[in-house]
Amino acid sequence: MTTTQIRTSTSTTPAPVAARRPVWKHGVAASVGAAVATTAIAALASADGVSFATEPGGPGIPPLGFAQLTLIFSLIGVGMAAVMARKARRPRSTFVRTAVALTVLSVVPDLTFGFDTPSAVSLITAHTVAAAIVVPTLAGRLSRTR
């Protein structure tokens, strides 16, 4: 009688893909963090007398408007990152280039819609802080090449 020994190989290191959470989970968390940060910036600026109005005495942007718009546009960025993760040849660099370009474009209204200087500076700061939270978080989840 002969016995056959079957060897099975086991890996002690988990597969990096299986251990990582998907892009969207980190993106949603970063979006919420960015919304909180931009709302805090708006609240601090408002407390310091910044109006966020395009004309003197006109209605300004409410602080919760910062949270709402930050969430909406950050989640659009999460969707872009998810699509680029599946379709782009170089997802990380494609996403970073696109996000930087969109961040630069996002400050154009702050400079051209007639905001006073403190309002424009606060809005640009809010855009920059939101991008500084969301973009590196998403870029870190994307692979360099597909």
Show which residues each predicted segment covers.
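Core segments of alpha-helical transmembrane spans in multipass integral membrane proteins
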Residues: 63-82, 97-105
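Membrane-water interface at the C-terminal end of transmembrane alpha helices
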Residues: 26-30, 34, 129-146
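Membrane-helix boundary connector in multi-pass membrane proteins
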Residues: 108-122
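Short, Lys/Arg-rich, polar N-terminal cytosolic tail immediately upstream
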Residues: 1-23
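Transmembrane alpha-helical segments of multi-pass membrane transport proteins and ion-pumping complexes
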Residues: 34-46, 74-82, 107, 131-136
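Internal alpha-helical transmembrane segments of multi-pass membrane proteins
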Residues: 23, 27, 82-103
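Short juxtamembrane and helix-loop transition motifs at transmembrane-helix boundaries
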Residues: 54-64, 81-90
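Membrane-interface helix termini and inter-helical loops of multi-pass transporters
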Residues: 49-58, 114-118
